[in-house]
């Protein structure tokens, strides 16, 4: 029997950890060098609740230069991973300011998983010192949960691509969200533009 196919699109600020999360999940390796993404696609197989699912992972550019290009990724999306970085309170602020309006415009009714990336940096001394200089601190778990409720996300998870903590759980939750949608409505995902 062929695997069920689901399309996952990941969005969030530039350098918030989107590509690392996808590569660690799909290839089990952590990229040490940061190269800004324009568009990348990965395929990964996952088994959830006894179902084989083939996930098409669509990586997107967070940089503003690509705001007009990014919507090309959205048609037929089954689930959105909306990311921020735990070491960047500004990236969390952009969730309701930028990412939620964009996603809800192009993908109404598509479930959103809010993901706090770079969890390993929450207690990192250097990170805390740098943020303190700007009178900031790492994002707290409850701030992430509150934001997930505020944007009506399907769920909220935190992970670290570097240590791999929580990575699999993110994609399991995303797959479940994508599968649930199929049961609830016949027309799937984002409409064509």
From Swiss-Prot:
Residues recorded as bearing ADP-ribosylasparagine in the entry? 41
GO CC terms on record? cleavage furrow; cytosol; plasma membrane
Which residues form the pro-region? 191-193
Entries under InterPro entries matching the protein:
P-loop_NTPase (IPR027417), Small_GTP-bd (IPR005225), Small_GTPase (IPR001806), Small_GTPase_Rho (IPR003578)
Q: Which Gene3D superfamilies match?
A: P-loop containing nucleotide triphosphate hydrolases (3.40.50.300)
> Which keywords belong to this entry?
ADP-ribosylation, Cell membrane, GTP-binding, Lipoprotein, Membrane, Methylation, Nucleotide-binding, Prenylation
Residue positions bearing lipid (S-geranylgeranyl cysteine): 190
Q: Which GO terms describe its molecular function?
A: GTP binding; GTPase activity; protein kinase binding
Q: Which GO terms describe its biological process?
A: actin filament organization; apical junction assembly; cell migration; mitotic cytokinesis; regulation of actin cytoskeleton organization; signal transduction; skeletal muscle satellite cell migration; small GTPase-mediated signal transduction
Task: Identify its membrane topology class.
Answer: Lipid-anchor
Task: State the compartments where it is located.
Answer: Cell membrane; Cleavage furrow
Which Pfam family is one of this chain's hits?
Answer: Ras
Motif Effector region mapped to chain: 34-42
**Where is the PTM Cysteine methyl ester found along the chain?**
190
What positions does the entry give for GTP binding? 12-19, 59-63, 117-120
Xref: NCBIfam families: small_GTP (TIGR00231)
What this protein is reported to do is described as: Regulates a signal transduction pathway linking plasma membrane receptors to the assembly of focal adhesions and actin stress fibers. Serves as a microtubule-dependent signal that is required for the myosin contractile ring formation during cell cycle cytokinesis. Regulates apical junction formation in bronchial epithelial cells.
Which family is this sequence assigned to? Belongs to the small GTPase superfamily. Rho family.
Q: What is this protein called?
A: Rho-related GTP-binding protein RhoC
Origin organism is Gallus gallus (Chicken)
């Amino acid at each position: 029997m062929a695997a069920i196919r689901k399309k996952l699109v990941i969005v969030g600020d530039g350098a918030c950890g989107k590509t690392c999360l996808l590569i660690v999940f799909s290839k089990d390796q952590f990229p040490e060098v940061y190269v800004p993404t324009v568009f990348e696609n990965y395929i990964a197989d996952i088994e959830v609740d006894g179902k084989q699912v083939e996930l098409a992972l669509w990586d997107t550019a967070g940089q503003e230069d690509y705001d007009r290009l990014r919507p090309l990724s959205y048609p037929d999306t089954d689930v959105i991973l909306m990311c921020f970085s735990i070491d960047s309170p500004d990236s969390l602020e952009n969730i309701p300011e930028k990412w939620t309006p964009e996603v809800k415009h192009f993908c109404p009714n598509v479930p959103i998983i809010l993901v706090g990336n770079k969890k390993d940096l929450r207690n990192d001394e250097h990170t805390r010192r740098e943020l303190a200089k700007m009178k900031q601190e790492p994002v707290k778990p409850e701030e992430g949960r509150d934001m997930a409720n505020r944007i009506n996300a399907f769920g909220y998870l935190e992970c670290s691509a570097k240590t791999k903590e929580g990575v699999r759980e993110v994609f399991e939750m995303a797959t479940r969200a994508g599968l649930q949608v199929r049961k609830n409505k016949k027309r799937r995902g984002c409409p064509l533009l």
